[in-house]
Amino acid sequence: MRIERVDDTTVKLFITYSDIEARGFSREDLWTNRKRGEEFFWSMMDEINEEEDFVVEGPLWIQVHAFEKGVEVTISKSKNEEAMNMSDEDANEQFEEQVNELLANTLENEESIEDLFEQRAQQQKHSHKSEQKQTKQRPNIRTVIVKFDDLEQVISYAYHHNLSTDEFEDLLYMNDNKYYYAIHFDESVSQEMINDSYSQMLEFAYPTDKTEVYLNDYAKIIMSHNVTAQVRRYFPDTVE
């Protein structure tokens, strides 16, 4: 499980289904068994608290997005002063109610995991619509961006991913000692392949809210055109 501290009140995590199974849960547990789903969310909160000191204080806002390879969860604490003064018991009860509501809504939804992922892709597309107007118009180009915490993660991805993306334009940026990898898929690639590629990239990297506009303005391009092949050329595999 990868945990990213967004700010003082928000954490984001991505956990693969294989990792979920290693923790004693199944993929079906999350969407068809409310009791097991609750156990899973509470176990995640315990681990987040242990690693990031993210204590349940007041109500939380939870967003869950299902991907083909796993689940992305964003958890935010309330910034409302009155809510922050809730007792621990009331806060826990409200959090449990939110988890129950979240699971209930999921169980009532007959759409598949793939449908939910497609919705997520559409949400991202709409959220970046205003920023896309500022970029140079490139017909039918769709961009995927992920973040690596260090160079070792970049190298690991370059050697061990199984994506056929070498024919597409790609860029490796650096900003604040973090690495951002962008792939521009052209019109020959289906949305399903893009979705699958993104979920596989998240096995090595993290989601990011940084856009291409932001990276072009504030980050430095350190590699371009067949980035993974260049990384393999200049750096040995760190995992033998």
Swiss-Prot record:
> Which InterPro entries would you find in this protein's record?
MecA_C_sf, Neg-reg_MecA
Family annotation (Pfam families) = MecA
Renumbered residue ranges of the record's region Disordered: 118-138
> A single Gene Ontology molecular function, please?
protein-macromolecule adaptor activity
Gene3D superfamilies, from UniProt? 3.30.70.1950
The free-text domain remark for this protein reads: The N-terminal domain probably binds unfolded/aggregated proteins; the C-terminal domain interacts with ClpC.
Q: Which NCBIfam families does this entry report, sorted A to Z? A: PRK02315.1-3, PRK02315.1-5
Subunit structure, interactors included: Homodimer.
What the protein does comes down to: Enables the recognition and targeting of unfolded and aggregated proteins to the ClpC protease or to other proteins involved in proteolysis.
Concerning its family, UniProt says:
Belongs to the MecA family.
Name the chain's protein: Adapter protein MecA
Lineage in the entry? Bacteria, Bacillati, Bacillota, Bacilli, Bacillales
